[in-house]
A protein has these predicted regions:
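Structured soluble/peripheral alpha/beta segments that form catalytic or ligand/cofactor-binding pockets
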Residues: 1-193
Length: 193
């Protein structure tokens, strides 16, 4: 279990073997008031992504597990008007991202992950770029019907990257894989409180 608390917040992440329970509360979360959440993650797939990624710097590494397509059940309540978001395990999913390591001080890491249903079957993906020496290993995976399928190289085509001092992150991105198994377009949405 992991627990952290401060003056205006507390978060508890419980590992109950066949489920994970997240309980969080934060006063003054945003302009509309406080946040309270209790979400339970269940139905852990038999296969997940586990990786130990080296860095070029000696004795630096990242050990990570991603569990996609876990069913989510619970509520998040936010604001003075108690706006409540309910997660139904029939159609709500989560990814559990657990990692440890010795990281280099300066990093650039792009990460994408999703879980949901395609034709009534659980489907998810995990892609990563730029964190550690990914020529040795990558975290690129597809998840379908509880099985993990390894992807090799996934290229992140970042708008304006490669010629501009600052990439234009709000323009559409595209992703391609060397084997043609993962092709995706993504248009960013910026929503800040």
């Amino acid at each position: 279990d992991v627990h952290s608390a401060g003056r205006n917040y507390s978060i508890l992440f419980k590992n109950e073997g066949d489920r994970r329970v997240l309980i969080a509360q934060m006063k003054n979360f945003g302009p509309e008031g406080s946040l309270y959440a209790k979400v339970t993650l269940t139905d852990i797939p038999a296969e997940s992504m586990v990786i130990a990624t080296p860095f070029d710097k000696d004795k630096h590494f990242y050990y990570n597990q991603k569990i996609n397509c876990m069913r989510a059940e619970g509520t998040v309540t936010y604001g003075y008007h108690n706006r409540t978001y309910t997660f139904d395990p029939a159609d709500s999913f989560a990814v559990l991202d657990w990692g440890r390591g010795v990281w280099t001080y300066k990093n650039t890491w792009y990460w994408g992950s999703a879980s949901g249903l395609v034709d009534g079957e659980r489907f998810g993906f995990n892609i990563g770029y730029g964190f550690g020496n990914t020529s040795a290993a990558s975290e690129n995976m597809l998840f379908y019907k509880g099985r993990a399928h390894k992807l090799s190289q996934v290229i992140f085509h970042i708008p304006g990257d490669g010629g501009r001092a600052t990439p234009d992150y709000m323009r559409p991105w595209t992703f391609t894989s060397d084997a043609g198994r993962f092709e995706m377009a993504y248009t960013p949405v910026l929503a800040r409180a």
